[in-house]
From Swiss-Prot:
It is an enzyme of class 2 (transferase). HAMAP family: ISPT. Catalyzes the condensation of isopentenyl diphosphate (IPP) with allylic pyrophosphates generating different type of terpenoids. It comes from the Bacteria. It comes from Synechocystis sp. (strain ATCC 27184 / PCC 6803 / Kazusa). Binds 2 magnesium ions per subunit. CDD domains: Cis_IPPS. Its cofactor is Mg(2+). Substrate binds at residues 30-34, 42, 46, 74-76, 78, 80, 197, 203-205. The lineage of its organism: Bacteria, Bacillati, Cyanobacteriota, Cyanophyceae, Synechococcales. The active site is at D29, N77 (proton acceptor). This is Isoprenyl transferase. InterPro entries: UPP_synth-like, UPP_synth-like_CS, UPP_synth-like_sf.
Amino acid sequence: MTIKPVILETLPPDLDQQRLPQHVAVIMDGNGRWAKQRGMPRIMGHQRGVDSLKNLLRCCDDWGIAALTAYAFSTENWGRPLEEVEFLMTLFERVLRRELKEMMAENVRIRFVGNLTSLPRSLQDEIARSMEDTKNNTGIRFTVATNYGGRQEIVHVCQAIAREVQSGKLDPETIDEGVVEKYLYTEGLSHPDLLIRTSGELRISNFLLWQMAYAEIYVTSTLWPDFDRQAFHLALRDYQQRHRRFGKV
């Protein structure tokens, strides 16, 4: 994260600063295909994908977007080959350790959401350290969904609310959307305005099911390691051409 891209460093003139999404979420798909197309092992695609994520984070910060959430590892991803899963866990840990100083310098506030207790202990420690060290930063809010599943999150919310009702701390008649929000992993974070999915797949893959209720969805055939500022520019331009009605006329 030490060299800023010179291309599109500032907001492109055809984008309206006042109509930018304040929160962008991204499903980073296509790392394996990118590597396969080049005769490389899948893990090389994941390594290049890290660079794309770092560049997107900096781009959001440069262009005035307040929050970025990335789908790094789903609850279903444990079903991938063991070698790939172990590599990803090591990669997450190594990147966190390497980039923490830079995130502090750039005022990034990082947060991890998901079932973090199932991750390797050493990775849990790095996650806890990064969140603790950046918790008072006031710049872009960077959320990383790790061992995350939207259905699992909703089950977690139901269990938490049930315990509160059972203990007499919560009246069932008072349960509304606001109560549910308090028990989400993403509590306190605004809902995404724009979801970007790379690689052309037309599904949301169990990502932020509650939070995506009114998000605009943009799908690009670009594979994640190739997703750059120009590709992000196209996504934002498409977003600004839409009229968000939130269920109204």
